[in-house]
Structure formats: structure tokens, C-alpha cells
Curated annotation (Swiss-Prot):
It comes from the Eukaryota. Belongs to the glycosyltransferase 1 family. Plant sucrose synthase subfamily. One of its GO terms (molecular function) is sucrose synthase activity. It catalyses: an NDP-alpha-D-glucose + D-fructose = a ribonucleoside 5'-diphosphate + sucrose + H(+). Keywords: Glycosyltransferase, Transferase. NCBIfam families: sucr_synth. One of its GO terms (biological process) is sucrose metabolic process. It is an enzyme of class 2 (transferase). Residues 275-752 are annotated as: GT-B glycosyltransferase. Its EC number is 2.4.1.13. This is Sucrose synthase. InterPro entries: Glyco_trans_1, Sucrose_synth_GT-B1, Sucrose_synthase_pln/cyn, SUS_EPBD, SUS_N. It comes from Vigna radiata var. radiata. Gene3D superfamilies: 1.20.120.1230, 3.10.450.330, Glycogen Phosphorylase B.
Amino acid sequence: MATDRLTRVHSLRERLDETLSANRNEILALLSRIEGKGKGILQHHQVIAEFEEIPEESRQKLTDGAFGEVLRSTQEAIVLPPWVALAVRPRPGVWEYLRVNVHALVVEVLQPAEYLRFKEELVDGSSNGNFVLELDFEPFTASFPRPTLNKSIGNGVQFLNRHLSAKLFHDKESLHPLLEFLRLHSVKGKTLMLNDRIQNPDALQHVLRKAEEYLGTVPPETPYSAFEHKFQEIGLERGWGDNAERVLESIQLLLDLLEAPDPCTLETFLGRIPMVFNVVILSPHGYFAQDNVLGYPDTGGQVVYILDQVRALENEMLHRIKQQGLDIVPRILIITRLLPDAVGTTCGQRLEKVFGTEHSHILRVPFRTENGIVRKWISRFEVWPYLETYTEDVAHELAKELQGKPDLIVGNYSDGNIVASLLAHKLGVTQCTIAHALEKTKYPESDIYWKKLEERYHFSCQFTADLFAMNHTDFIITSTFQEIAGSKDTVGQYESHTAFTLPGLYRVVHGIDVFDPKFNIVSPGADQTIYFPHTETSRRLTSFHTEIEELLYSSVENEEHICVLKDRSKPIIFTMARLDRVKNITGLVEWYGKNAKLRELVNLVVVAGDRRKESKDLEEKAEMKKMYSLIETYKLNGQFRWISSQMNRVRNGELYRVIADTKGAFVQPAVYEAFGLTVVEAMTCGLPTFATCNGGPAEIIVHGKSGFHIDPYHGDRAADLLVEFFEKVKVDPSHWDKISQAGLQRIEEKYTWQIYSQRLLTLTGVYGFWKHVSNLDRRESRRYLEMFYALKYRKLAESVPLAVE
């Protein structure tokens, strides 16, 4: 009788040795092709392209063996003849390195530091010697359990609760940290949960049972004030709830925890404890305001994200404070840069109330040097020398505004995150990090060849700031799994910081671990007062239709729109983004220009860049020049419309719906997109959406069901997919409705601001609690980070030239 038996998992080296002996000639043929490319780096798609060029018979032999598996998992190949080194990623977050001598067919397995040293020879011609600074954060987390399953990535708080609840509640003695936390928890000197009448865990359980018994005798709606004095006498303060029913639920949750600890119950209980009253959100760069700024340099989705986030957060904070029976007024402050030269915006105003809120404001603090306040806009790539002084100034302003410390500091993007790290360190406050986009992923090979890009982008400074912030923070929220750990075939933004090198500066052998429980996926949504389905006719903003008609179809060409649409009966494919290389708007225009069938089926409308004024952004200037060239090369006038960036979000919402009325589609063609807010906006309006497979949109959209994935590196295939869709719709119009409805359903399930704000506040409570009762504040690594900041980051920041006024 056959029996199942466990077999040893062979190492990468063993598997390769077996394949080498079986398929020596085929492997030699492929590696010789790769070596023949000469000194340099081949990305995953280039390695696969070389593989596809070898004879089919050889290809088939390799496909089924261990070498085929290695090849499919290879993210990059380093060629330094006669050696070829491979960075192999069998699954997200797991890396192995090897190199092969093509002439001798000798295989060596490398450690990360050895691989990086080999890679550095591309730049230096020889290694930097034995005394290069190597950064390794792994020892600081070695004693702390970490998940190993892919499904745990981005679910850090669940893992943390499972591990620490078992540890914390295993006997009476271990309950003292919880008791201390509940006794010390206060706001503005007022104790919120327990007073000093409760001295030990036994007394706590006794009091909770006594309170439970009493609450069972009063009507559920009885206000807390009716029994406040009675509860205070036995040791309970007023943070348990606003009425008898709510207080009873909270008490029973804690009793359940003390009886039989459970991670879900723990999270629910901690989510009820009122911990967050003052929130500070940092976003220094760009033009941060509520009107007339979208489309300005460095000003796009991040501004929209934060404003929507703040409205949702304030609502949830008010709701929770009320439910817990407290009369505390929350505050949310968005900290950004004050721009004296505000260029027709409110960016020169110190304090500005956030529309649609009661207690949230934008607080602007200027950049300052020893010569005074910096007046002009500065690119996000050049802010580094100002941020340390800026942090001190922000701390001073916060003390004035809040009359105390915030409960949560949220950083946004690289500059906001390093300021958040410095502030959280100074004030001892829980820190949350939101990257939005890590530039190292957006600019391939920007680490190894950083010196070539340094004058323009100062990536050495930015990557150092990113590494510092992601290791300093208490928790990181991302919009998608891909942002953390990519997909089967692509590397995640954070994952790309696992091991990398900046030759001549430092070598990162362990920068971040994507399995770290600090990672949590919390996806945002679109503002549903602005973005709603085109079929909701009673809500449609018809007052904008004349203006939108002018934008899309006017025969006039001016600074706001050029080129005309001659056939108004055709559906419109539409895109809206900043005009930069990564957003790849000119790429979409080129795909369209080259595909005669697509041009026959649909018109193309692009909202990008601002032709009404001269851009200060070098990338935008280059992309504008390219756009004019494409219009001329492909004779696009008549089928194409280029509209300057549109600042009015409310009208933009109706613009999406008007495009949907034409039975068109939204296309997001970015080379890489961290999340894809415009994708969510378009889908929320019911517009079928085609979006990049690189980054967040790959998770937002279920391919072929709620939209379509496109590969920006294969524009011809993307254009063919659009042709296929519109030809199908021509034959069967219900196909358009089917994709539209599935997109709407997908948004309702996962991408709303209400879900987001509930999750963010719960995470803050959980991580704040664990910091108090455990060693989760990572003191050892923070001392290491202080040294890294002082000895590396500060010098790099000082090397960035100050702006010329």
C-alpha cells in the first residue's frame, strides 16, 4: 500500500547542482546569452526575454526543472563576465543569492552582504574593501517572534495580539502591566478607566463582577451619570461607556479576557478604550491647501488622501468619544509648510480650518534658515536641509496649539515621515508611517547608480530618511499588500529596502522585514459625497455639464485644452494624473497613437500638467515636450484632447460620471502606482477601469471581473486589451454594465473611509497598549538609529544645496 512520506527540502545549491548535471548544455546556452550582454544589470523581464530567445526544445527542458524555477524567481541578474549573479525570490519577502561562473559552470551561494559587494563592482570596478558601513536591523528583532506565512504580511496587529495576549494573560502575576495601564490611562490629568482603589488583579476582577451584577439591574439606556458616583467609589472611572449597555459590554469584554484570553476580544476591548484625542498629521512638501492646488508641482493624491482621511478620522473620534461617555473635544492638526509666496493659494495662511470638520485645521510652519524664512516652493527632492530646524519649530507650534502632547503622530511620504520620527522620539508619542510612494521603487537602479542621480534627486538623503523612519515607527499602514511585499512576480516597495547598496556610502544587509508585525494594510476610499455612481441621477451635478461640455468638446484650443474631438458619438477613454515620467501619461498617448483600431473605436482625453503657466518641474517640462511631439507624430488632433490639470474636485467627480455616460473607460497607465486613488475614484463613479499591474491597482481590481490589469512595459498589449473590451461592448452593451457594477461592488466591500478610520484608531490603541506593557518600543534599535541619523543622515542633508531665493 502506498504511503505518504515527508521528504527533505533540498537547498537552492543542491537543486541547481542536480539541474546542472542534467541540462548542462541548455543552461550554458542561456547563461552565455546573459553574459554576452556585458557588464550591467538585467531586470526580471529582461532575464525572461533572454530565456524566451533560446531554442524551444532547450527552453522546455529548463522550464520543468529547478533552473526554470530559479529563473522565474530571479528579480535581477548582475553580469560581470565571466560571473552572473542572481537575486532569487522564491516568494514575497524571501530572498536567496547565488552566482555562476559561466565558463566553469561553478555555482556559489552568497550571503546578502557578499551579493551586494559583488553588485558594487558594477560601479567601482572593485569592491570597497572590508570597512564599508553595513546596516543590519535583524539583531534587534531576533528575539521577537515573527510570522512566516505570506497571509500574515500586512496583518501585523492580529499576529501581535495572538502572541502577546497569550503571554500577558497566562497567570495573575502577568496581569499587573494591564492593571497599571488601565490605572495610568488619563487625559489632561483626568483618570479614564481605573482609580487607585483597585490595587491588584484580584481586586479588579471582584470590582468588575460587582459592576456587572449591578448593571444587570438597570435599564440599558441608563446614562452613566446615574451611577457615576457609585462606580467611582469602587474604583471605576467614566471611560467605560456613555450608558449602562455600553459600560456592561466593555466590562464583559475585560472579564472574558481575564477568564480566557482571545486576540479578537483583546483588540475589541482596546479599540473601546479612549486613547486618541489629539492627532498630528505631517505632510511638509508641496502646496498643501483645499482649493486651487491640485496639479501644482508635488501636489496630488497625497493632499486629497489626507483631507479625506482627516474628515473620516474626526467623525470616528467624535463617535467613539461620545460612546465612551466623555465630553472631550478632539483636535486634528495637519502640519505642512507655510509658503509666503503662495501663488494664489491659501498656503501663506498659518491656520486654516478643514472644510466639513469642526475640530481639524491645517497648521502651516515655514522652512527657516539662519538667514530667515524661505519664501518659495521647493521640490520634494530638495527639502532635506530644512527638516531638522522645521521639526523644532513644529514642536514649538504644537505645544502652543494643543497645550500638551498629541496622542498619535502620522507621517506622510519621506519628508513627513522623518519629521514624524524626530517628533515622536522627542515627545514619546505613538508614531504611524504612511509612505504613499517610496522613490527607490519608482526609479529602477536608483540605489546602485545613486551618484548619477544625486545632483537632481538627492536620493542618498531620501533613501536614508526612509530607512530611518520605517525602522523608527511604531506601526506602518499601507494601502495594499503590494506596497509591502509586491506580488509573486514583482518586489514590494518596502521589500526593496530589505537589502540594497549605495556604493561608497553604506550597504544595507537587512533594512526591513516585510513579515514585521508593525505592517498593517488599511486601504483608503474616495470621498463618497463627491464620487458616486453615474446612475444616481438625482445626485448628479448637472450645473457643471456646460463647463464639462466645453472642456471635452469645444472646438476652441487654448491654454486649458488643445486638440479637438471630431466624432462625439465615440466612447472616451480617460486618464487624469500628474504629468511625470512614472505616471506614464505620454506612454498611454503613444499606445493610442500607434493602434489604429483603438483610434477608430474611441476618443482619448487626458487631464495632466498645467499649460496655463510655465512649470518649475523638470520632469513635467520634459513630459510636456514629449506630449507635443506625440500629437504631431501620430496626427492625434481630431481623436485626442489634452486638458490642463483641473483643481475642482467636485467638478472632477462629475467629469468621471460624464465619461461614464459616453460608455467610456478610465485608464491608469503608471509604471508604478503605490495605491491608485484615481482608480478608486473612477470605479466609485461606475467607470470601467484599466490600471497598471505594478502596485496597488493590481489588488484593487480583480482582473476581468471588476476591471482590467495592464502592463505599462507592454503598451501594445494594453491597447489590444482596450480594443477587445470596446469591440465586445459594441456587440453586447451589457458587458460594459457588468464590469461597471462589479467595480462598484468591489469598492463597497473594501475601499471606504469609514472602514479606514475605524481601523486606524484601533491600531493606535493596540500599538500604544503594547508599547506600554512590553518591549515593543524597540529601545535598542532606536539607539542604533540615533547613531545612524547623527553620523549619516545629517551629513547627507547638509550636502543638499539650499534653495536660491
